[in-house]
Structures are given as C-alpha cells and as structure tokens.
Amino acid sequence: MSDFQREQRKNEHVEIAMAQSDAMHSDFDKMRFVHHSIPSINVNDIDLTSQTPDLTMAYPVYINAMTGGSEWTKNINEKLAVVARETGLAMAVGSTHAALRNPRMAETFTIARKMNPEGMIFSNVGADVPVEKALEAVELLEAQALQIHVNSPQELVMPEGNREFVTWLDNIASIVSRVSVPVIIKEVGFGMSKELMHDLQQIGVKYVDVSGKGGTNFVDIENERRANKDMDYLSSWGQSTVESLLETTAYQSEISVFASGGLRTPLDAIKSLALGAKATGMSRPFLNQVENNGIAHTVAYVESFIEHMKSIMTMLDAKNIDDLTQKQIVFSPEILSWIEQRNLNIHRG
C-alpha cells in the first residue's frame, strides 16, 4: 500500500466515523443507581482525580485514540491537543504506524505534543509492531503511556487488512517487558472477556481499555470501504462496554481498567467508574465537537461534562471514584443473564 493510499484510508476512517451515530440501545441504559435523597457531601467536596499505580489524571475522562497520518488529521490532532491543554484532559493519538513508516508523517502526531507540551499523551501502535517501533512511538511523542490496539475484527473486514494474529500475544508480552511507560492494551469497539483478561495478566499487562461496542463501529467503517459492502451482518459483533467491565471484575485489583466505547453522557461515564473503571475515554463526541463547533465550544463542552459528573457524584454521595464502586446498582434482566451465563462474580457494597 502506498503512502497516498494510507493517507486516504485515514481520512476515510474519520469521515465515516463522523457520520456514524450512537447505537439506539445502550447497555448503559440497562443499569440504574439507587437514589438516596439526602447527600452528606457538597459538590465542592468531590475529587475526580483518577489514580493508578503509574498514572495520575486530573479527571477520569480522556480524549481517546482517533487519528493522525494525513494533513487533515494533523489539523484534528492539533485542535484536540489544544482542548486537552485547556481542560487538563489526557489525550491519545491514533495509530502511529504512518509516522513510523514515513518520517514525513511524524508531524501529524507530534503536533499534539507541540500544542500541549506539559500534558498527558498516550502514543498508539498495533499488536504486531516490532518492539523497537513501539519504543520509537513512545519517544516520538514523549508519551506518558502507550496504547496497543487489538482490532482483529476490523482487520478481517478491512479489504487490505491483516490476516495473521498468532504472534500478537507474544509480541505484546515483549513490548510490555521493554517499554518503560505504562502499556495499555486497547480494544477498538468490540469489548473484552474474562478469558482475555486472564491471558493478559499472565504476560504482565497492568492496563487495559475494554472499548466495548456501542460507539465508533470499525466493522461498519471497513464494510463501507468494501466493494460489495457484504459484511454488514457483523455490525453488532462483540461485547458492550458494560458487559466488558463486568468481565474484568475479578482482575480489577491487579489490572487498571479504562472504559470506552459508546459513552454518551456524564452518567455513562459515572456508571463506568462505578463498575470499576479508573478512567473513561471518548473519541467521536470530541471529534464531532471540535470539527463542527470549534475549540472554544469543545472546551466548554468538556467543562460542562466534568461539572455534570460532579453533580451526579453528589447525588450518589460519592466523594471520589473509589466511593462509586460501593454504590448500589440495579441491573436489567438482560445484564443479569449475561452475568449468570458467564459465571461472573459481582459483589458490591
């Protein structure tokens, strides 16, 4: 594939993603908090700091991996980096493979560090990238963490995608052992299972982003790029973010779990944190805001999002993220069925 074709593919991904809408039915709507009428705290008491063994985020919300690798996506990364700088959010760039192959493309990613020199930035590579390239990806952005995206359904629907996956787990293990910053194993919208969590724990992984279905749909994106658009029947493949978080429950004491995929509102973010996530990521909401409404409006959107999270936590009488994990939740029969059939041990305060 030529560099021009890769740039074109990057732009196609963004164009199709922006045109997508959230799933009509979300598993976030299948879980409810129990309301208690008189909080014992005030809004100003809320501490939204997200703390993991290696990363401290001012807020448990981050701009998730999206793009880079073309002139248009450079402009997007520049604007998102300004939003991150002005709001204190962490930010992940999209796959840096284009820059690792072609130094001419490096600026489409490094613009994020240029515009946000003191901020928290996650670099991003695929599960098949050599260890040396993973190290380069971290150095390229002076990144505080490295996302490794695992995207086998996307690759298999992508006309020119990868068809070989047998080395992925061993390669991830090699990267985790060599890279000095936290390595986050990131799905891309298909969710994670307890079996995967077991495998990742065995090779020393300490961070995952479950990225469940319900948000940006890469099966649909790649199917749109197929000549016959003949794989639309896989549109609903995978686990939702709620299901994925429940799958991780037994591993949350050893692995820091981030949640993304289909988060629409501050309430969805709070529900994710209550299910054990340490932070929540969103991609398309930020992309649409910054492209359609500009930087200032997106900054205001983030500030409002954070204030709404504080309001919800006050209603829940939760001073911090750890408190949220003790709050009572009522699940729908469908979610309860998933818990039962998957033999998940869910114990709450």
UniProtKB/Swiss-Prot annotation:
Binding site residues for substrate: R9, K10, S95, T96, H97, Q154
Keywords: Cytoplasm, Flavoprotein, FMN, Isomerase, Isoprene biosynthesis, Magnesium, Metal-binding, NADP
Subcellular location: Cytoplasm
Required cofactor(s): FMN; NADPH; Mg(2+)
Annotated catalysed reactions: isopentenyl diphosphate = dimethylallyl diphosphate
Coiled-coil zones: none
Pfam families assigned: FMN_dh (PF01070)
Main location: cytoplasm
GO terms classed as biological process: isoprenoid biosynthetic process
Entry's EC annotation: 5.3.3.2
Quaternary structure annotation from Swiss-Prot or TrEMBL: Homooctamer. Dimer of tetramers.
Family indicated by similarity: Belongs to the IPP isomerase type 2 family.
Protein known as: Isopentenyl-diphosphate delta-isomerase
Species whose genome carries this gene: Staphylococcus aureus (strain NCTC 8325 / PS 47)
